[in-house]
Design a protein with these regions (language model features):
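Residues that form generic nucleotide/phosphate-binding pockets
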Residues: 16-19, 33, 56, 60, ...
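Short, small-residue-biased leader/transition segments that mark boundaries at the very start
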Residues: 2-6
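A non-catalytic, helix-rich entry segment at domain boundaries
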Residues: 35-99
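Short alpha-helical hairpin
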Residues: 8-36
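Short, flexible loop/turn segments with low-complexity composition
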Residues: 72, 205-206
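Short alpha-helix boundary/capping segments
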Residues: 7-10, 45, 138-142
Length: 206
């Protein structure tokens, strides 16, 4: 489809951030330490949980009642994490405009926002995140940069004026945390994203 053509020609937001990140080295150090088999297992486990939780939230917001969880301990964990987000996070969202919104900004970058809706009366890019442990704010710059990138693309594509990003995170101990980026912080991360994007396009030819 057309989406695939665009995706091939345009780097995703996560591709840009991964290539511009200082975290790459710590990730490969960890992989060297635990070995490929264990690293792959841990990554797959995290991905599987994340996928189930995202699908469950999407179904819930679409009014679809379907059990999508695998019948094992991971599925059980994902189910509990989803319930926590539904009970604690979704109450923050007073209106949902769109789910899994595909965004492409003229040959610069592309991405898919989990949710676009209203939080605290403001139009917001909303991302649901699952984690082993709730992360400290200073560790998740990339999540904020990603949200600002999506806001920027959405604003240009649809002539909106979104200037708020919400990261709604749940961990395996069923702790929930809302990170809200707005006003000066939103400007800061938007500028930082533009710098990284520029550097990426100057480093790699797309």
């Amino acid at each position: 489809g057309l989406g695939d053509v665009y995706k091939r020609q345009v780097p995703s937001v996560t591709t840009v951030l991964d290539n511009m990140s200082d975290k790459k080295s710590s990730l490969s150090e960890w992989r060297n330490r635990v070995g490929d088999i264990e690293a792959d297992r841990v990554m797959k486990e995290a991905t599987d949980i994340g996928t189930m939780v995202h699908l469950s939230l999407e179904n819930h917001l679409n009014g679809i009642d379907e059990d999508i969880f695998s019948a094992n301990s991971l599925g059980n964990m994902a189910k509990r994490m989803s319930k926590k987000l539904i009970d604690d996070a979704l109450v923050n969202i007073s209106e949902v405009y769109g789910l899994e919104v595909h965004l492409v900004l003229n040959k610069l970058y592309a991405g898919t926002a989990d949710c676009i809706g209203v939080i605290d009366g403001k139009d917001t890019i909303i991302d649901f995140k699952t984690s082993k442990r709730i992360k400290k704010k200073e560790w998740i710059d990339d999540y904020f940069l990603q949200g600002c990138a999506y806001a920027n693309a959405h604003n240009i594509m649809f002539e909106t004026n979104i200037s708020q990003v919400a990261i709604l995170m749940v961990d395996r101990d069923l702790m929930y945390k809302k990170f809200l980026i707005k006003e000066n912080e939103f400007k800061h991360y938007t500028n930082l994203w533009k710098q990284k994007l520029l550097k990426f396009h100057n480093t790699f030819s797309w």
